[in-house]
A protein has these predicted regions:
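N-terminal, charge-rich interaction modules
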Residues: 1-79, 178
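Short His-Asn-centered micro-motif
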Residues: 55-56, 108-110, 130
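Short, surface-exposed beta-strand/loop "edge" segments at domain boundaries and coil↔beta transitions
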Residues: 61-66, 113-116, 137
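Short, flexible, solvent-exposed loop/turn segments with mixed acidic/basic and small polar residues
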Residues: 88-99
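Short cationic amphipathic helices and targeting signals
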Residues: 99-109
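Helix-rich interaction surfaces within compact, conserved domain-sized segments
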Residues: 114-133, 139, 156-165
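A cross-kingdom feature marking charged/low-complexity
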Residues: 140-184
Length: 184
């Protein structure tokens, strides 16, 4: 499993991500994203974007780090997105109980392979990635533990370790560029 995470840990993370509070900023207003629901405000704000993603650089590999280290990683992610010519907006994710919160970036119109590569490069197991006009989807960079099979809003992405090449499986057509398994 990526990042050395056990199936039990992946299941815990998935449950946490599915219930988290996601927000993105536009015109000074923080707007909500909910996994499994469409994002019409986002679609309206960026009508030309075919898809959207949300990611952080905090706590790579799910290893808790000091705030100063997470902020440094966040700046590195911003620099990388600038180099790649990506458009992005401030965002965050928080536990419903507010016991944790992470700075995130809403990425506008990311290419699927580039987005997955950023997630891997910054040690992120879970991101959000979905096509415009469709419900927000959780994208896990791991094999699906048995406890997580069946959620229709989770994509499980597995990359070939030896080559770094990803193979398509089943996901929305414009997001199926990695070996992606949707929960049945």
């Amino acid at each position: 499993m990526p990042h050395g995470a056990s199936p039990d840990r992946i299941a815990q993370l998935t449950a946490s991500y599915l219930t988290a509070d996601y927000r993105w900023e536009h015109d000074g207003v923080w707007r909500r994203l909910v996994i499994g629901e469409p994002a019409p405000e986002l679609d309206a704000a960026f009508p030309e974007a075919p898809r959207f993603g949300l990611m952080t650089a905090a706590n790579p590999g799910q290893q808790m780090r000091a705030d100063i280290d997470n902020r440094s990683a966040d700046r590195a992610l911003q620099r990388r997105m600038d180099v790649l010519g990506l458009r992005y907006r401030p965002a965050f994710v928080a536990a419903p109980s507010r016991v944790w919160r992470a700075y995130n970036w809403l990425v506008v119109a990311p290419e699927v392979d580039a987005f997955d590569a950023l997630a891997r490069d910054f040690g992120q197991i879970g991101t959000l990635l979905w096509s415009r006009g469709t419900p927000v989807r959780l994208r896990m960079q791991a094999a699906a533990p048995e406890a997580c099979v069946g959620n229709p809003w989770v994509d499980w992405v597995m990359h070939a370790v030896d080559t770094g090449v990803a193979e398509p499986m089943s996901a929305p057509a414009d997001i199926a560029k990695a070996k992606t398994v949707r929960s049945p």
